Amino acid sequence: MIHEILPVGWLQCNCSVIGDPETREAIVLDPGDEVEKIAEILKRHKLKVKAIVSTHAHIDHVGGLKKLHELTGAPVMLHADDLPLYQAMDVQAAWIGMQPPELTEIHQLLKEGEALHWGAFEAQVLHTPGHTPGSVSLYVPQNAGKVTLPAPQLFAGDTLFAGSIGRTDLWGGSFEGILRSIRGKLLGLPEETVVFPGHGPTTTIGRERESNPFLQTQ
């Protein structure tokens, strides 16, 4: 697996480029900004983007969708419950004092349990609301499609962080909802699952299950 993580924009959203070294097909997760740097990674690995996925519709995760779609022609994917947030980009931009990015059409609405395929790889869509109503995580099992990985992988967006969880004080957030998502859908994954959050360092499900302070009490 080709996997490069690029922190983009002034909020340093972790954009992931995940490619199949054999077929050169790839998906790009959360291209929030700095599309020219994402393009450099794609060019260096000679990757063709099959899908552009946003784990949720906050401005720091979707700011580069239009440019990357125009560059690659790949469809843009988002959960339907975050469409109101996506369509309120001018409001989001005003919150943090920046110009709103140009928007592109959402070409495919992500659904719970849906499988995304690129090359020999497969990822399962998990609807994990709480940070936003339409937040999703992508789970890549160890036997991911036609290949075997060293460990399962979880691309958690802003739902689960190393030692923390996503904030829930913004529009559509729910503290109870995010805990329900994490406990109900994420903590039951294999403990060796490597977690790639939307910001900050990687972690594992086992580490968060054992020591994340937000997950130690009911």
Model-based region annotation:
Residues 29, 76-78, 156, 197:
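Hydrophobic residues in well-ordered beta-strands that form the structural core
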